[in-house]
Amino acid sequence: MHNASDIQSALVPMVIEQTAKGERSFDIYSRLLKERIIFLVGQVEEHMANLIVAQLLFLESESPDKDIFLYINSPGGSVTAGMAIYDTMQFIKPNVSTVCIGQAASMGAFLLAGGEKGKRFCLPNSRVMIHQPLGGFQGQASDIAIHAQEILGIKHKLNLMLAEHTGQPLEVIERDTDRDNFMSATQAVDYGLVDAVMTKRG
């Protein structure tokens, strides 16, 4: 029985290139990595975050002065995995330009906003959604209280960072992330999550 990721891997197209040494084949994502394009697709979780971080660090080592392009189509996911990607984006020398294709929700929206100012984009029919972090805990009452305190701290920290990236006042961010808040591409520009709607390349 094959799981969804096995099936998806089998469906990834291969690109064949002619070189001086003969033919070379790449999966499509590896070929795009040569153009400094990284795809962040699907749930944000630890394994995916490690791959994104590794690609960011590799591209920095290749050309520290050239922009990196991070294409995002994600429903969100783990805060800690997302913060690993975010911190690396801020840490490395190249500017990271973010582009929303499809959707950038929750942690996906946070990473979209965390791109280099002036280089954050949405495609015309993409959607962006911001909200507060989710938590579900079981166990002893004292442990639940500890986790509740932790998630409130994370919520406040994420709101502060989102306020910095969007230019919105903290109280506006706190109000707007209290529940799921969906935006069109143009609304995301108005809010400050991205800088422009990209309709054509160039």
Swiss-Prot record:
Its EC number is 3.4.21.92. GO terms for cellular component: cytoplasm; endopeptidase Clp complex. The active site is at residues 106, 131. One of its GO terms (molecular function) is ATP-dependent peptidase activity. Cleaves peptides in various proteins in a process that requires ATP hydrolysis. Has a chymotrypsin-like activity. Plays a major role in the degradation of misfolded proteins. Keywords: Cytoplasm, Hydrolase, Protease, Serine protease. Its main location: cytoplasm. It catalyses: Hydrolysis of proteins to small peptides in the presence of ATP and magnesium. alpha-casein is the usual test substrate. In the absence of ATP, only oligopeptides shorter than five residues are hydrolyzed (such as succinyl-Leu-Tyr-|-NHMec, and Leu-Tyr-Leu-|-Tyr-Trp, in which cleavage of the -Tyr-|-Leu- and -Tyr-|-Trp bonds also occurs). Belongs to the peptidase S14 family. It is an enzyme of class 3 (hydrolase). HAMAP family: ClpP. This is ATP-dependent Clp protease proteolytic subunit. Fourteen ClpP subunits assemble into 2 heptameric rings which stack back to back to give a disk-like structure with a central cavity, resembling the structure of eukaryotic proteasomes. It is found in: Cytoplasm. It comes from the Bacteria. It comes from Shewanella sp. (strain MR-7). One of its GO terms (biological process) is protein quality control for misfolded or incompletely synthesized proteins. InterPro entries: ClpP, ClpP/crotonase-like_dom_sf, ClpP/TepA, ClpP_His_AS, ClpP_Ser_AS.
